[in-house]
UniProtKB/Swiss-Prot annotation:
Protein name from the UniProt record: Photosystem I reaction center subunit VIII
UniProt cross-references to SUPFAM superfamilies, sorted A to Z: Subunit VIII of photosystem I reaction centre, PsaI
Listed transmembrane segments: 8-28
Record flagged with keyword Chloroplast: yes
Species this chain originates from: Chara vulgaris (Common stonewort)
Length: 36
C-alpha cells in the first residue's frame, strides 16, 4: 500500500526540487564562466 502513495510524493519532488537544483547548478556555472 505504501507504493500507492509514492507517486504523490515524487511528483512534487521531481517537478519542484529537481528544476531548482538544475537552475542553481546552471547559475553557478554561468557565474563561474563569467560569460555575461
Amino acid at each position: 500500500m505504501i507504493s500507492a502513495y509514492l507517486p504523490s510524493f515524487f511528483v512534487p519532488l521531481v517537478c519542484l526540487v529537481f528544476p531548482a537544483i538544475a537552475m542553481a547548478f546552471l547559475f553557478v556555472q554561468i557565474e563561474k564562466e563569467e560569460i555575461v
